[in-house]
UniProtKB/Swiss-Prot annotation:
CDD domains: Ribosomal_L18_L5e. Gene3D superfamilies: 3.30.420.100. This is Large ribosomal subunit protein uL18. The gene is rplR. One of its GO terms (biological process) is translation. It comes from the Bacteria.
C-alpha cells in the first residue's frame, strides 16, 4: 500500500525550489536574486550562476535597530539593502528566485521593497 502520510513543509519547499531552479538561471548581466529564511533571520544574495559567484549579499545578521530579525519589517530592510548594494555594482535587472517559498508574507515584502528601491524583476 502507498505511503499516505503527507510530506513535511521543508521537503515540499525543496521540491518547489528544485523545480524553479530548473527554469531560471542567473548570468553576469542578469544575476539571480536568491532568498533564504531561517527561524531567526532573513538572507538574500545576487548570484552569477555562470561564474558560480555571489555578487552581493545582505541579511539581518548584522543589522541593528530592528525589533525582530525575522519579521516582515526585517525582510523589507534586507530588500532595501540588497537593492542599494546591487545598484552600487551597476546591476539593475535580476531574476527572482524565491527559494521554493510561497510568494506571500516576508518573501513578498522583500520583493516589493527591492523593487521600490530600484531593482527590476
Amino acid at each position: 500500500m502507498a505511503n499516505l502520510q503527507s510530506k513535511s513543509s521543508s521537503a515540499k519547499r525543496k521540491r518547489r525550489h528544485f523545480r524553479v531552479r530548473a527554469k531560471i538561471n542567473g548570468t553576469t548581466s542578469v544575476p539571480r536574486l536568491n532568498v533564504f529564511k531561517s527561524n531567526g533571520h532573513f538572507y538574500a544574495q545576487l548570484i552569477d550562476d555562470v561564474k558560480q559567484k555571489t555578487i552581493v549579499a545582505a541579511s539581518t545578521l548584522k543589522m541593528t535597530g530592528l525589533k525582530s530579525t525575522s519579521n516582515i519589517a526585517a525582510a523589507e530592510k534586507v530588500g532595501d539593502e540588497i537593492a542599494k548594494k546591487a545598484l552600487d555594482k551597476k546591476v539593475t535587472t535580476v531574476v527572482f528566485d524565491r527559494g521554493g517559498y510561497l510568494y506571500h508574507g516576508k518573501v513578498k515584502a522583500f520583493a516589493e521593497a527591492a523593487r521600490k528601491a530600484g531593482l527590476k524583476f
